[in-house]
Curated annotation (Swiss-Prot):
Name of the gene this protein is made from: aroA
Protein name: 3-phosphoshikimate 1-carboxyvinyltransferase
Record's keyword terms, sorted: Amino-acid biosynthesis, Aromatic amino acid biosynthesis, Cytoplasm, Transferase
UniProt keyword Amino-acid biosynthesis, yes or no: yes
PANTHER family from the UniProt entry: AROM/DEHYDROQUINATE SYNTHASE, PENTAFUNCTIONAL AROM POLYPEPTIDE
Protein's organism: Laribacter hongkongensis (strain HLHK9)
HAMAP family assigned to the protein according to its UniProt record, in alphabetical order: EPSP_synth (MF_00210)
Cross-referenced Gene3D superfamilies: Enolpyruvate transferase domain (3.65.10.10)
């Protein structure tokens, strides 16, 4: 197995330019493909997940061109009518491609087979499929019911229909439905139960609006796209830096003295994970923000405070808090993280196992993790990453106290291929 050994380094400082947001990149690419007109999307993330979306769009007949030596893509939209009506799409483990494309293909009509790697076939999609069937889509499971792979067939979608979706598994299901509603000639989605990860739904709605469609809403319980809604190109649009990726560097500043500044995202970000900075501040870190940057440094006391925090609003960035808890002065509890269990791996179980290797006392439940740090971290732990990019990036922070080995470090290619180079650039 390939591994990366990180030597201990107690002090980190510097500036990191963030790559584009994965969540924004894949949403913008899909909306540009569905719109009328040509769209220039600037700053698209270069990573496995966006590659899967770009490849799928090309297979579906979308004309796109990348500007030389840049991450700008010119996309000629299809006005909601996919040029290719039959395709076999491999989407890896990219949930931000698989879920939205499932909805956009099911409501537009055609014959499609969607599949991915083994882990993608373990990630639930049944709630989204049922909601799409409620709008008249015809979808069958090609393997285990409730999970990919999927076969999509031409359906009988009735404009203005109403469907329901559960809100407690993944907000990506609702986001996928919202982006696809204009393809159905408008309609309504009602949310059953408490919606998790609300900031990601807000992000989706903001981007939909940038492409000329306004979705009416009743809080987070009911969303309606009016009949006749059509996506229109905004001309040019820019992808923010990835706020989830910012969390590792901001934590590095809080744990390693700092200051560490990230650029590409700031106080006006449309991403919910920007609130990770608030969580660090609650732990005592010094936080400062500008329009296009955030900076973190260690508390004046030199050590973070333990916290109890509801992480519903920052599910991805909350993983970074779990590792930061190793450096806090007591027991930290992170709650409302049930969605961790259906991500790239069961992140609650994986996090508990790997924190334990570093000497932490860890307690877990269905939707929480509680971490009590040891007096001294165990040096030389070999951290398994479970083919999960965020596990690899989170546990690099342990090297602020002890030497650590990261197994399968290349898994960061899913969202941030250059992560370890960027992390190394902060070593004083």
């Amino acid at each position: 197995m390939e591994f990366l050994d990180l030597a201990p380094c107690a002090t980190l400082r510097g500036t990191v330019a963030l790559p584009g947001s994965k969540s924004i990149s894949n949403r913008m690419l899909l909306l540009a493909a569905l719109a009328t007109g040509k769209t220039q999307v600037h700053g698209v993330l270069e990573a496995d997940d966006t590659d899967r979306m770009l490849e799928a769009l090309q297979q579906l007949g979308i004309r796109l061109a990348q500007q030389a030596h840049s991450r700008t893509f010119c996309i000629e939209g299809c006005d909601g009518r996919w040029p290719v009506r039959q395709a076999d799409l491999f989407l890896g483990n990219a949930g931000t491609a698989f879920r939205p494309l499932t909805a956009a293909l099911a409501l537009a009509g055609g014959d499609y087979h969607l599949h991915g790697i083994a882990r993608m076939h373990e990630r639930p999609i049944g709630d989204l499929v049922e909601a799409l069937q409620g709008l008249g889509a015809v979808i069958e499971y090609a393997g285990t019911p409730g999970y990919p792979p999927l076969h999509i067939h031409p359906g009988h979608v009735t404009p203005g229909s109403t469907t329901r979706v559960k809100g407690n598994v993944s907000s990506q299901f609702l986001s996928a439905l919202l982006m696809a509603l204009p393809l159905a000639g408008g309609g309504t989605v009602e949310v059953e139960g408490e919606l998790i990860s609300k900031p990601y739904v807000d992000l989706t709605l903001r981007l939909i609006e940038r492409f000329g469609v306004t979705v009416g809403r009743d809080g987070y319980s009911r969303f309606t796209a009016e009949a006749g809604s059509h996506y229109r190109s905004p001309g040019a649009i820019h992808v923010e830096g990835d706020a989830s990726s910012a969390s590792y560097f901001l934590a590095a500043g809080a744990l390693g003295g700092g200051p560490v500044r990230v650029t590409g995202v700031g106080r006006n970000s449309i991403q919910g994970d920007i609130r990770f900075a608030d969580a660090l501040a609650a732990m005592g870190a010094g936080i400062d923000m500008g329009d296009d940057w955030i900076e973190a440094q260690a508390p004046a006391s030199g050590r973070l405070r333990a916290v109890t925090l509801d992480c519903n609003h920052i599910p991805d960035a909350a993983m970074t808090l779990a590792v930061a808890a190793l450096f806090a002065n007591g027991t930290t509890t992170l709650t409302n993280i049930a969605s961790w269990r259906v991500k790239e791996t069961d992140r609650i179980a994986a996090m508990a196992t790997e924190l334990g290797k570093l000497g932490a006392l860890v307690e877990t439940g269905h939707d929480f993790i509680r971490i009590t740090p040891p007096d001294q971290l165990t040096p030389g732990a070999a951290i398994d990453t479970y083919d999960d990019h965020r596990m690899a990036m989170c546990f690099s922070l342990a090297s602020l106290a002890v030497p650590v080995r990261i197994n399968d470090p290349r898994c960061v290619a899913k969202t941030f291929p250059g992560y370890f180079d960027a992390f190394a650039s902060l070593r004083a």
